[in-house]
Amino acid sequence: MTSVLFTSGATVTFRELIEVITSYDFIVETIIGNGITRMIVQYGNEIETGTQKHVSEEFYRQCVEDKELKQSLQLEVVSGSQNDSNVVTYRSNKYRGFEMVVFPFSNDIGSFISESDVVISHAGTGSIIDTLRLEKPLIVVTNDKLMNKHQEEVADELVKLGCCRKMTIEDMKSSQLKDCISEILSGPETFNKLPECSTTEVEGIIYHELVK
C-alpha cells in the first residue's frame, strides 16, 4: 500500500490546501494517478474562541459536501480508529483499493508520518521537524495568506539544504505536484539525509527565522 499524508497543522485552517485536496480531479489525477492507495488528511483543529465552533472540521466538511466528493468517489465509512475516535477511514467503491483516512488532529501524528511514503505539509515548524526526524520525503506547501513570511523563509532554507521540496498552492493545482510525487515514488532518493547534528541545525534555522 502506497500512502501520502497531507497535514495542514493544528492552529490555523489552511483553507487553500483543503480546497485543492478535496477536489475529485486532484484526487483522481494526482493521487490515484500516481498509484497511491491510501490518502491521509489531517485537516486542522482550529477552534473559534467563545463559540467553540470547530472551524477546521466545518470547513473540511463543507468542501467535501460542495464538491460531492463522497458521491463522486463512492466513499463509504469503513470504521473509526480503534485508538482515536476522531480518525475516520473511508473506502472507495469506484476505485477499488483506494481509501481516505481523515482527522482534525492527532497526538500521535508521528505514526501517520511513519506509515506514509510522501508527506505534503503546511510550512509549520512542528510538522516539518516531525517529518525530518522520521526521514520521510517532504513537500512543503507555503501559505501566502499569512502576513508573517517566516514559514516561507524556513522552507527556502530547508530546500537549500536539500531536505525537502517547496510548492505553492498554484503549483499544486498544476501538474507540478503530480510530477514531483511521481519522481519521489519511482526514482532514487531525492532528498539529502541530515547528518547527526542536523536536527539541531534545522531547529537553529527555524529559531533564527522566528526571532528575526
From Swiss-Prot:
Oligomeric form and interacting partners: Heterodimer with ALG14 to form a functional enzyme.
Pfam family, one: Glyco_tran_28_C
Catalytic reactions on record: an N-acetyl-alpha-D-glucosaminyl-diphospho-di-trans,poly-cis-dolichol + UDP-N-acetyl-alpha-D-glucosamine = an N,N'-diacetylchitobiosyl-diphospho-di-trans,poly-cis-dolichol + UDP + H(+)
Organism: Debaryomyces hansenii (strain ATCC 36239 / CBS 767 / BCRC 21394 / JCM 1990 / NBRC 0083 / IGC 2968)
InterPro entries: Alg13-like, Glyco_trans_28_C
Domain of life: Eukaryota
Protein's name in the database: UDP-N-acetylglucosamine transferase subunit ALG13
GO cellular component assignments: endoplasmic reticulum
Intracellular or extracellular location(s): Endoplasmic reticulum
Job description of the protein: Involved in protein N-glycosylation. Essential for the second step of the dolichol-linked oligosaccharide pathway.
E.C. number(s) listed in UniProt: 2.4.1.141
Enzyme class: transferase
